[in-house]
């Protein structure tokens, strides 16, 4: 029987790793994700998880160790955040290029400088071009479930790419919520044994991994990573469907909320989706035709789902906890690219909010709604990007 309990998202991530039965875990502690490897080390020390736990001196070493372990043919896991993920950047490309389905939990935290240990998405968003699949959790249950789904998708032979699962620093990592821990037997049926055919070290089958590629071969190698990410679109849908059958919880790349007659739809990710849905309920009671959409999968970017969502509304607005310096928020930019060749598309707005752990309040969302309403009334967007919740007295 599944176990109903309460726990932090960090603990939920550790339980997900335990259920997935990785053989090698390598990690270096960093706020706010330290509890994940701490809990896993307890599982290993207590004999509850048969795995090698490698204590390393940096996040760069942690991901490097997992590249070697995954190339040797075993399931692997790690967790990090913020500057730790940034330190891994060099090796993230290597893991994807070598087609190693490593899974990593991320307590989404702001990047320095200034130093900040609280939540936004800049750490994972900054890794969007590395070839890693990216999932974002709204709550602690999703943190557990999406790690299991990450293994399911990453290890599929049509994909064979690493994956990361982000959940918001402190808002989720250190907050206790109800979580259902699934049966080990059901998880075993869902994931199966990891038996790689493409990459493993075997004296009877000598191969070279991570070798030099000359111009005559390099481009094809990069194409295959791109193709695998495209393949992941279908594999993710299949994994979501199978997960629902086995565990009873439904996931979608984009989950819609009260969008059927919405003139304005706000899109976001992570725990902010819960706030947004509550705010939509309040605005509906006040007579506003607004809806919400939560993006669970950011890479591969849900192009078709965004196109379908765009057909339902007159204004599509994004609330995001990241910024691509010199342009807009990354999610808005990607969505704009997805819609560029559509003959009809809604007005589009981007709202930057909640950076460095600043609360995103109903008042801030009201500010965004006011701007969206003005664009709707005028039939045009005069300024696509807006920062909401700024303390202008500090500027």
Curated annotation (Swiss-Prot):
Signal peptide: none
GO BP terms, alphabetized: response to oxidative stress
Keyword Oxidoreductase: yes
UniProt keyword Secreted present: no
EC number of this enzyme: 1.2.7.1
GO molecular function per UniProt: pyruvate synthase activity
Superkingdom in the source lineage: Archaea
Gene3D superfamilies: 3.40.50.920, 3.40.50.970
Alphabetized UniProt keyword annotations: Oxidoreductase
Catalytic activity entry: 2 oxidized [2Fe-2S]-[ferredoxin] + pyruvate + CoA = 2 reduced [2Fe-2S]-[ferredoxin] + acetyl-CoA + CO2 + H(+)
Residue ranges of coiled coil: none
Short name of one Pfam family: PFOR_II
Subunit text: Heterotetramer of one alpha, one beta, one delta and one gamma chain.
Name assigned to this protein: Pyruvate synthase subunit PorA
């Amino acid at each position: 029987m599944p176990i109903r309990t309460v726990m932090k998202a960090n603990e939920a991530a550790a339980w997900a790793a335990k259920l997935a039965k990785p053989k090698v875990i390598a990690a270096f502690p960093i706020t706010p994700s330290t509890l994940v490897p701490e809990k896993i080390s307890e599982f290993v020390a207590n004999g509850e998880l048969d795995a090698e736990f490698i204590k390393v001196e940096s996040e760069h070493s942690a991901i490097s160790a997992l590249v070697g372990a995954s190339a040797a043919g075993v399931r692997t896991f790690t967790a990090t955040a913020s500057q730790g993920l940034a330190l891994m950047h060099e090796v993230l490309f290597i893991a994807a290029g070598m087609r190693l389905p490593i899974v990593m939990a991320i307590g989404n935290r702001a990047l320095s400088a200034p130093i900040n240990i609280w939540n936004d998405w800049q750490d994972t968003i900054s890794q969007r071009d590395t070839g890693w699949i990216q999932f974002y959790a709204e709550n602690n249950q999703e943190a557990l479930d999406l790690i299991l789904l990450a293994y399911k998708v990453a290890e599929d032979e049509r994909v064979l790419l690493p994956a990361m699962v982000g959940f918001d620093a402190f808002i989720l990592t250190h907050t206790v919520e109800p979580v259902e821990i699934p049966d080990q037997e059901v998880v075993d049926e869902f994931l199966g044994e990891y038996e790689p055919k493409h990459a493993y070290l075997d004296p009877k089958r000598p191969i070279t991994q991570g070798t030099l590629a000359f111009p005559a071969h390099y481009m094809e190698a990069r194409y295959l990573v791109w193709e695998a990410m495209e393949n992941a679109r279908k594999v993710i849908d299949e994994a979501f469907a199978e997960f629902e059958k086995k565990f009873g919880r439904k996931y979608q790349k984009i989950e819609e909320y009260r969008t059927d007659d919405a003139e304005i739809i706000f899109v976001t990710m992570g725990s902010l989706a819960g706030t947004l849905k509550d705010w939509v309920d309040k605005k509906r009671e006040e007579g506003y035709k607004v809806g919400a959409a939560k993006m669970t999968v950011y890479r591969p970017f849900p192009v078709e789902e965004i196109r379908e969502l765009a057909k339902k509304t007159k204004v599509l607005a994004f609330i995001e906890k990241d910024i691509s310096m010199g342009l807009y928020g990354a999610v808005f930019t990607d969505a704009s690219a997805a819609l560029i060749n559509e003959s009809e598309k809604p007005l589009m707005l981007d709202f930057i909010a909640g950076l460095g752990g600043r609360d995103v309040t109903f008042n801030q969302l009201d500010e965004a709604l006011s701007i969206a309403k003005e664009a709707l009334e005028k039939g045009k967007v005069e300024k696509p990007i807006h920062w909401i919740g700024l303390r202008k007295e500090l500027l």
